[in-house]
Amino acid sequence: MTEESADFEIVNELANATDRNCLVTVTNVIFDTTGKLVGEAVSQTTVMAHSTTQVQNTGTIAAPDLWSPQYPYLYTVKTYLSYQKAYQVHEMKVGIRTYRFHSDKGFILNGVPAILKGVCLHHDAGCLGAAVPYEVWTRRLIKLKKTESKMSMRKKF
């Protein structure tokens, strides 16, 4: 990945629960936050009856906006599965970034050293118990990021 382009790889897992083989077209399209198409990849494969298979689509995004805690840019990936005249659409948000851990420089995010400030949280939510609702974790993490500039978390147990 460079400032000029970022290669992407999307692995699509397909399941065929029918009694016949299906020729499926898998289309992955990537949109920026304005809705502009910035990447696309298409492939076809036969999914055997009562089996699963993986389809790998690859492509390139020109001049990518990189995700970081300070600039959490998210692209929208839409996956279209089509078989004969029927189709299914799946949508998700993704960020583009590089990261690595270096023995001398520490954590490197998008080529820049970053300090991981974090907390250790118990697995439960007090009176709510151990089955903590998603909303509680969301509220906790937003509060930690805003008030204490934390960007990492370790859970106990």
Task: Enumerate the language-model features and the residues they cover.
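Secreted/periplasmic carbohydrate-active enzymes, especially glycoside hydrolases
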Residues: 1-156
